[in-house]
Amino acid sequence: MQIRCLIVDDNQAFLDAARLLLEREGVAVVGLATTSAEALRLEEELRPDVVLVDIRLGDESGFELALQLSGTVIMISTHAQREYAEDLAASPAAGFIPKALLSASALLRLAGVN
């Protein structure tokens, strides 16, 4: 079964690059969102298996969005995980992937898919 993923980031260039990378590695990227409101709408409409959420969504917080999402959430950022250790521990996120290390294998491992 192919994993279905929604990616949430306020940077369109990153969204396009991440989609291309993950689709080349066999992930079905079912949607892209640049705001929390758009992400919530798309999650309900598309029912992805996992949602990748940027920690900093412009003026919005990816952690606040993670609390509102119903599915599996993995946080992403260009910044190091140690900067967000407390927030990550308190969030419902299944894990964290630095944007530079984003891959289908990392996503599948954190989402609990073998």
Language-model segments: residues:
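The feature encodes the CheY-like receiver
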Residues: 58, 81
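Two-component/phosphorelay signaling modules centered on CheY-like receiver
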Residues: 12-31
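Acidic catalytic/metal-coordinating carboxylates
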Residues: 35-38, 61-64
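C-terminal output helix
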Residues: 83, 100-111
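Active-site residues of response regulator receiver
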Residues: 9, 54
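As written
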Residues: 88-95
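Hydrophobic/aromatic residues positioned on beta-strands within the core alpha/beta folds
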Residues: 76-77, 99
